[in-house]
Design a protein with these regions (language model features):
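Catalytic PLP-binding core of fold-type I/II PLP enzymes
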Residues: 151-183
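Conserved N-terminal alpha-helix of the aminotransferase class I/II PLP-enzyme fold
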Residues: 13-61, 83-88, 94
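Active-site C-terminal subdomain of aminotransferase-like
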Residues: 135, 142, 150, 187-286
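PLP-dependent aminotransferase-class I/II
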Residues: 99-137, 141-144, 151-158
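Conserved C-terminal alpha-helix-loop-beta "cap" of PLP-dependent enzymes
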Residues: 75-76, 268-269, 273-342
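Conserved PLP-anchoring active-site segment centered on the Schiff-base-forming lysine
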Residues: 71-89, 118
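General beta-strand structural signal in soluble alpha/beta enzymes
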Residues: 3-6, 55-59, 81-82, 141, ...
């Protein structure tokens, strides 16, 4: 059975597997204090065009989100995100488990706009009782969004300016950052993104690595005791070089973006295949997540031969389903998907 369930259901890039194998017998210091981690950090600083950026390697996305948010915010502060934001919907209340309220606002096409944020902050500050409330201290967005959408240069610039106006830190979840940056909908590069937020992370788990995320403090200094907080949140890998080697490999010869482009090319073809067969597109995502509308009968038939996820049961007659591509997606798998659709 072919699978389009997620972008992390394969092992890892062959290049990473080879690099881990070659260095397997070496003995290095733990917790990221090794030559490979230092090399990876330097490559990331060059990639973001900021020699003063502080880089840390953590083991997974949820741990990264909770560690960054909990480290940056004071105990009485909360984090703003859209109603469909990953930390609100798909992280099991992890942020709130560490004492920070997730303050949700409506999104437009799954994105938070500067006008929505500004209106909320003006209303909040105009309330004379706001000192008795959870104080907004950070804005969280993901790039791309939960629905595969991409923030434009204009949108990101305006949002960051609004955050600065209200003294809010902007944190960008980049679990799928590579796919967002190489999509045709994106009109900026990694250095631009790094200059228009306070902290972000470069996703590895969903972009070719076995595991791991690289947190980059580009617009602010890392909070005091951030390394200690990484461990407190269960996000510090004792065999830290395993993360360093992976990111050192990903940021050698532009590999991170090469594999992201491959995934986008595969997703674009999936989009075309479904359109060719008259299947409605639910959200016009320009990235590696494609969302289509299936009837219950088509879902039942297709799911017997192809692995994918239900995103939302919209009605009795419409099921929104997600198909995801990655570095490992093959043209032959798309050929098979098209053949299956022709036979149903």
């Amino acid at each position: 059975m072919i699978s389009f369930e997620s972008d992390y259901n394969n092992g890892m890039l062959p290049e990473i597997l080879e690099a881990l194998g070659k260095t397997n017998s070496e003995k290095t210091s733990g917790y990221g204090f090794d030559p490979y981690s230092e090399s990876a950090k330097e490559k990331i600083r060059k990639a973001v065009d900021n020699e003063n950026a502080e880089v840390f390697f953590l083991i997974g996305g949820t741990q990264t989100n909770t560690t960054v948010i909990d480290s940056v915010l004071m105990g009485c502060e909360g984090v703003i995100c859209v109603e469909t934001g990953h930390i609100e919907v798909h992280e099991s209340g992890a942020v709130e488990a560490f004492g920070h309220k997730v303050i949700t606002l409506p999104g437009e096409n799954s994105k938070l706009t500067s006008s929505t944020l500004s209106a909320y902050m003006d209303t909040f500050l105009a309330d004379e009782t706001h000192p008795h409330m959870v104080q907004p201290g950070m804005v969280y967005i993901s790039m791309p969004t939960e629905f595969g959408m991409v923030y434009t240069r204009e949108e990101l610039t305006a949002l960051y300016a609004t955050c600065q106006k209200y003294n809010l830190r902007l944190f960008i979840d980049g679990a799928r950052l590579g796919y967002g940056l190489v999509s045709e909908a994106c009109d900026y590069d990694l250095p631009f993104l790094a200059k228009h937020c306070d902290v972000f992370y470069i996703g590895g788990t969903k972009v070719g690595a076995m595991m791991g995320e690289a947190v980059v403090f580009s617009g602010m200094k890392a909070p005091k005791y951030f390394f200690t907080n990484i461990k407190r949140h269960g996000a510090l890998l004792a065999k830290g070089r395993m993360l360093g080697i992976q990111f050192d490999t990903l940021f050698t010869d532009n590999l991170y973006f090469k594999i992201s482009r491959h995934a986008i090319a595969m997703a674009t073809r999936i989009h075309s295949i479904f359109q060719k067969h008259g299947i409605a597109i639910a959200y016009d995502s320009p990235t590696n997540q494609q969302f289509v509308v299936l009837s219950p009968s088509l879902y039942d038939a297709l799911s017997k031969k192809v692995a994918f996820e239900i995103w939302e049961r919209k009605s009795d007659t419409e099921i929104i389903c997600r198909f995801v591509t990655s570095w490992a997606t093959k043209e032959e798998e798309l050929d098979e998907l098209e053949h299956i659709l022709q036979t149903l």
